[in-house]
Every structure is written in C-alpha cells, then in structure tokens.
C-alpha cells in the first residue's frame, strides 16, 4: 500500500526497530493516511484523495 499524502507528499519514514537485546531490524513508519472525498469547487464534483491527518487538521482539505 502506498502511504503517500496527495496534498503534502509526506511518505513513509525508515529506520531500525531495536529490541531489548539491541538486535536491530529494519522497519518503516507510515503516515496516518485517510481516504477523503474532497469538493473541488462549490457545487462541483467530488474527488477522492489520500490525505494525511496533519493536512486534515491544518484545514488544507475541504471535505464534502
């Protein structure tokens, strides 16, 4: 699944998961991406986008 925000372009972050014995394994942190129906203009068509919750909280998307 491609966890990329259509508004800001935020994608997954990569790093290591470190256990108690300090064994390191690769992992990724995906942004919280939600499917949103967005109104392109008043009275216009709705468009389905994948948007991160930080963009929704910032008001960059008008849901409809």
Curated annotation (Swiss-Prot):
Superkingdom of the organism of origin: Bacteria
Family: Belongs to the bacterial ribosomal protein bL28 family.
InterPro entries: Bacterial_rp_bL28 (IPR050096), Ribosomal_bL28 (IPR026569), Ribosomal_bL28/bL31-like_sf (IPR034704), Ribosomal_bL28_bact-type (IPR001383), Ribosomal_bL28_sf (IPR037147)
Entry-linked Gene3D superfamilies: Ribosomal protein L28/L24
A GO biological process held by the record: translation
CC per GO annotation: ribonucleoprotein complex; ribosome
Protein name: Large ribosomal subunit protein bL28
Alphabetically ordered keywords of this record: Ribonucleoprotein, Ribosomal protein
Entries under Pfam families matching the protein: Ribosomal_L28 (PF00830)
Gene Ontology molecular-function annotations: structural constituent of ribosome
Gene name for this UniProt entry: rpmB
NCBIfam families in the cross-refs: L28 (TIGR00009)
Species the sequence originates in: Mycobacterium leprae (strain TN)
S-S bonds: none
